[in-house]
């Protein structure tokens, strides 16, 4: 139903049609991650790095009620200048933002959703949300994990502040596989925990993958 509100940039659309690699990028880092103009400079540098490595970047956001897969430099600057005035958009927020014609900075959850709608299979981010320490009493569990269980988009790595044992338990509930981080030239079943220096947790599958 939301597909009719989806705008795929010409660059991204042509890359997908030609079978070129496309990498989705979130937009909360632009609006909420750092101040202007560093946020815009960082976003543009990330896109530049992706292009230099042979792929096409697709920064994802909601602008005036449209689901954007691939932003122009002007749209990135628009989000960067607006900053915290742009609300973070999770799955529950999409219908409201679309109906009101509002802007939204896409979290991991909505970036995955829109990437999948556009046909993008790989998503790069600083880290997904997860199960926070003490969640057995607070229920502080990120919507990112529910999305991982239902949206077939590859995304890398949890952040360090989370509870690894609770996260792995929750992964069984939503039925997703924690597999790898694709930032290096080797792949290992423990790479999900790349930002955690020491850990004693192991995943169920030890599979090596030649290509993302």
What are these regions (language model features)?
Residues 32-34, 60-77, 112-113, 117-118, ...:
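A glycine-rich phosphate/pyrophosphate-binding beta-strand-loop-alpha-helix module
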Residues 169-211:
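N-terminal low-complexity segments that are often proline-rich with Ser/Thr-Pro
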Residues 20-23, 27-28, 55-61, 95, ...:
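Structural motif
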Residues 14, 27, 32-34, 39-97:
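Glycine-rich nucleotide/cofactor/substrate-binding loop typically near the N-terminus or early
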């Amino acid at each position: 139903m939301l597909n009719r509100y989806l705008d795929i940039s010409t660059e991204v659309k042509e890359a997908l049609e030609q079978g070129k690699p496309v990498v989705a990028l979130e937009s909360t880092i632009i609006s909420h991650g750092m101040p202007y103009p560093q946020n815009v400079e960082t976003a543009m540098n990330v896109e530049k790095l992706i292009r230099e490595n042979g792929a096409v970047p697709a920064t994802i956001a909601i602008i005036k009620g449209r689901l954007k897969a691939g932003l122009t430099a002007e749209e990135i600057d628009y989000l960067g200048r607006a900053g915290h005035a742009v609300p973070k958009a999770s799955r529950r927020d999409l219908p409201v933002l679309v109906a009101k014609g509002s802007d939204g900075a896409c979290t991991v959850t909505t970036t995955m959703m829109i990437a999948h709608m556009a046909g993008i299979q790989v998503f790069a981010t600083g880290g997904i949300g997860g199960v926070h320490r003490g969640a057995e009493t607070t229920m502080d569990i990120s919507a990112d994990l529910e999305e991982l269980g239902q949206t077939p988009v590859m995304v890398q790595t949890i952040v360090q502040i989370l509870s690894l044992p609770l996260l792995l338990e929750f992964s069984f509930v939503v039925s997703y596989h924690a597999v790898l981080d694709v930032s290096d030239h080797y792949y290992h079943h423990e790479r999900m925990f790349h930002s955690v220096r020491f850990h004693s947790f192991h995943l169920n599958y030890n599979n090596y993958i030649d290509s993302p």
